[in-house]
A protein has these predicted regions:
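Pore-loop/selectivity-filter region of tetrameric P-loop cation channels
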Residues: 27-29, 79-87, 202, 206-207
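Transmembrane-helix bundle segments that line or gate the permeation/cavity pathway
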Residues: 37, 59-76, 106
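A structural signal for multi-pass alpha-helical bundles of membrane permease subunits
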Residues: 59-67, 150-470
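Short, membrane-exposed interhelical loops at transmembrane-helix boundaries
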Residues: 75-94, 360, 429
Length: 470
């Protein structure tokens, strides 16, 4: 990448052409600044370097030494001859070793990057002094970072947040996928260790338990993609149509209608989805209404409902549950999309609409030739985001089907999956109910790959089309 190349080239030039103070600052950050008359900077960078080295010496090194095995000493009770009591031995905690090792790797990378920046900074000071110019003092440097380089100040905390709450957990997730961390290997009572690609073979290979996970992954991935597609585009087009109807000049009280549809967004999903689950249960009010209206008998007659059922299994049979979930998601998602579409439709250039009307275009032609392309060009990135969000849409699936849907598919059941599971709900169930962290980590990687590939491909095509309405 150009940015990385420029950074390393700048460091290489600084280290090659720098004086002794510049070169030595790579190892002892403060010495370079002392040599170039920057005492406050020297104190601050020495403090930062000292904290980093302290962490590595007392927390990083002991755990990195055990990183290859993730521990060898199990927790057990031993007899202490001093106290004449049974006490817990000095055992290894595999997860603590893994966690601290990953943090240590990040700290090491950060220290190296910081050392390179210190060398580059010292080289700049060296050149300023060689030119006979005066270098900034500490207060002047602070003013620079509050003015010309204020963007650096603003980005510091967000970058730290990304490292701590995104990069480190991601590294741990990837690492766990290569271990046997599950219910039989739970720290601190037991140890887990590295198993290489075994978990990936379990997911994609064949034979025994492997075949059930491979079968389940294919089924769950297929439903996840089908769900994400319909959940995204039904709400997208539904929101557009609803926005057009409400904003039409013939519609009475548009503000009232817009407010009524907003209720589904205003009420938390945790409340609405649990209520809806009760409405659509086998003995719920909706089934009672369908039976009284003769719909249940009609479905029996046309073969869409098994003769032995006296109710419509909205949330208890795979096909019905998938259809019902998508319909409920339309009810939840269309009002939100309506608001976005309303804003976009109001910003379509009036001259485009007027030109089309003069050319004799009817409303349908104007929608497909002007409004829809404009909406797609503006909301393209939002559609990609919505698709990824729906791939990870935990609430709708889990709250509607948990404790209601029971699978009869034994292969799915053996791998703790259900027909209506998304990858993310399957992952959640593996961790929270069955403590199968190793396979959950593999699924987490698969979710990331699916979302990343889709996002990259979509943005590639979006960038090609973005100039159409510019």
């Amino acid at each position: 990448m150009p940015g990385e190349k420029n950074f390393f080239q700048t460091f290489g030039e600084a280290f090659a052409k720098g004086d002794i103070f510049t070169k030595v600052s790579f190892l002892v950050w403060g010495l370079g600044y002392i040599g170039h008359g920057q005492l406050m900077k020297a104190l601050l960078v020495t403090l930062v370097e000292g904290l980093g080295l302290y962490f590595l010496a007392f927390y990083g090194a002991p755990n990195l030494a055990k990183f290859g095995t993730l521990g060898t000493v199990k927790m057990e009770m031993v007899f202490d001859v001093t106290t004449m009591k049974n006490v817990v031995n000095n055992y290894d905690n595999s997860f603590e070793i893994l966690l601290m090792s990953m943090i240590s790797f990040v700290v090491i990378a950060a220290l190296i990057a910081a050392a390179m920046m210190v060398v580059t900074s010292n080289y700049q000071l060296q050149k300023i002094r060689a030119a006979g110019k005066k270098t900034n003092n500490f207060l002047q440097d602070i003013k620079v970072y509050l003015n010309e380089k204020f963007y650096v100040t603003l980005l510091t905390l967000p970058v730290l947040g990304v490292v701590v709450f995104t990069i480190v957990p991601l590294f741990i997730l990837i690492a766990v996928a290569f271990t046997n961390y599950d219910q039989q290997h739970m720290p601190p009572n037991d140890l887990f260790t590295w198993v290489g690609l075994t978990n990936f073979f379990t997911l994609f290979g064949g034979g025994g338990m492997t075949s059930t996970f491979g079968y389940s992954f294919a089924k769950v991935l297929t439903w996840t993609l089908v769900w994400a597609f319909f959940a995204t585009f039904t709400t997208f087009f539904g929101g557009i149509l609803l926005a057009m109807f409400i904003n039409d000049k013939k519609t009475k009280c548009p503000k009232l209608w817009r407010t009524l549809f907003m209720v589904t967004i205003a009420v938390p999903q945790f409340v609405t989805l649990l209520l809806v689950r009760n409405f659509f249960s086998n003995n719920g009010i909706f089934n009672t209404m369908m039976a009284n209206a003769g719909v249940t008998d009609f479905l029996h007659n046309i073969g869409l409902l098994d003769k032995g059922l006296s109710y419509i299994p909205f949330l208890t049979q795979p096909g019905w549950a998938m259809f019902t979930i998508i319909m409920i998601n339309i009810w939840i998602g269309v009002p939100y999309q309506m608001l976005i579409s309303t804003g976009v439709l109001m910003n379509i250039p009036a001259d485009m609409i007027e030109a089309a009307r003069i050319d004799g275009a009817n409303p349908v032609q104007m929608f497909f030739r002007i409004k829809l392309p404009y909406l797609l060009s503006v909301q393209g990135p939002s559609l990609v985001t919505d698709f990824v969000r729906n791939v990870n849409n935990f609430n709708v699936i889990y709250l509607l089907t948990q404790d209601v849907f029971v699978t009869n598919n034994q292969q799915l059941a053996q791998s703790n999956a259900k027909e209506i599971d998304l990858l993310v709900t399957w992952l959640f169930r593996l961790t929270q109910e069955y403590y199968n962290y190793k396979m959950a980590a593999v699924l987490g990687i698969m979710v990331f790959i699916v979302c990343a590939v889709f996002t990259v491909v979509c943005f590639h095509f979006i960038n090609k089309k973005e100039a159409t309405f510019s």
